[in-house]
Amino acid sequence: MKPIKVLGICGSLRAASTNMGLLRFAREHAPAGMEINIAALGEVPFYNADLKQKPAAVQALLADIKQADALLLACPEYNYSLAPALKNALDWASRETDNYLLAGKPAAIMGAGGGMGTARAQYHLRQVCVFLNLHLYNKPEVFSSAFDGSYDEKGNLINEKIQGMVIEQLGALQNWVARLRS
Ligand SMILES: Cc1cc2nc3c(=O)[nH]c(=O)nc-3n(C[C@H](O)[C@H](O)[C@H](O)COP(=O)(O)O)c2cc1C
């Protein structure tokens, strides 16, 4: 079997991002048969339909999404919703012909944030994913606090319980991709 290629997309751009820490941990602990890459969003501009020639960072993002069998969306919570960098990445991808980059693609969501561990933002993101026709895996969910010591000063995930949840989610995503393929 070819390995499942998963693309991580992180809604936070800061160097010590805890959401990026979640994705890094996932990449380092991907199960056998799964490879995780992480998209570079730092240079991706806001979606603008006037940009007929797509900027290089957008082209790279779209190519990464195209080759991915599944998406792993790391979703910070900004003002009760998903962060703009993540929404912007999905907006760019959604404008390709017939939404072919996203429609039917399996995906899972994880997040690190304030009091509710990004629950509000994640459920908002799920609503967005309905329109995009991404096939989200429901459980296990990964909610975590960015402020309770679960992450070190560089944003690395150090909480063993959350680490276990991420590993469990990756296994579930792998099964989900296999089910959708069969
Ligand atoms: C503009 C802004 C709005 C935020 N609003 C919320 C919020 O509504 N709920 C919440 O739990 N955290 C909120 N936070 C805190 C973020 O969830 C927190 O900074 C999180 O760690 C960001 O992820 P990062 O570590 O990956 O950068 C907000 C942060 C910013 C910058």
Q: Which residues are covered by each model-predicted region?
A:
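Glycine-rich phosphate/pyrophosphate-binding loop and the adjoining helix
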Residues: 1-2, 7, 136-182
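N-terminal beta1-alpha1 ligand-phosphate binding loop
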Residues: 2-33
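A generic structural motif
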Residues: 30-37, 135
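N-terminal beta-loop-helix "entrance" segment that forms/cooperates
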Residues: 41-57, 150-151
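Helix-loop-strand module that forms the ligand-binding subsite of alpha/beta enzymes
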Residues: 56-132
